């Protein structure tokens, strides 16, 4: 499974948890990991790790300002 596929699966699992499904399962490094509603923060950290590994994160920018 590629990192992109892992990221898509992790995002789908997060969506499932956030919409009321009690348990979501993700393949992580060749093993099966189950996340529950109480481990949403762990799943978000995992998604952030995958985004870094795939180069999908962008640095946050400050608010746009109007200068005269």
UniProtKB/Swiss-Prot annotation:
It holds the Pfam family gpW. InterPro entries: GpW, GpW_sf. Its main location: virion. GO terms for cellular component: virion component. GO terms for biological process: viral life cycle. It is found in: Virion. Keywords: Late protein, Viral capsid assembly, Viral release from host cell, Virion. It comes from the Viruses. Belongs to the lambda phage gpW family. Monomer in solution, assembles into hexamers on the prohead. May bind FII and portal protein (Potential). Plays a role in morphogenesis of the virion head after genome packaging. Presumably interacts with the portal vertex to stabilize the packaged DNA within the head after packaging. Probably binds to the head-tail connector protein FII. This is Head completion protein. It comes from Escherichia phage lambda. The gene is W.
């Amino acid at each position: 499974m590629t990192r992109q596929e892992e990221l898509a699966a992790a995002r789908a699992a997060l969506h499932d948890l956030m919409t009321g499904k009690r348990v979501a399962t993700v393949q992580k490094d060749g093993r099966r990991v189950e996340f529950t509603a109480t481990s949403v923060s762990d799943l978000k950290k995992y998604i952030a790790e995958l985004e870094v590994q795939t180069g999908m994160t962008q640095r946050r920018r400050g608010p746009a300002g109007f200068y005269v």
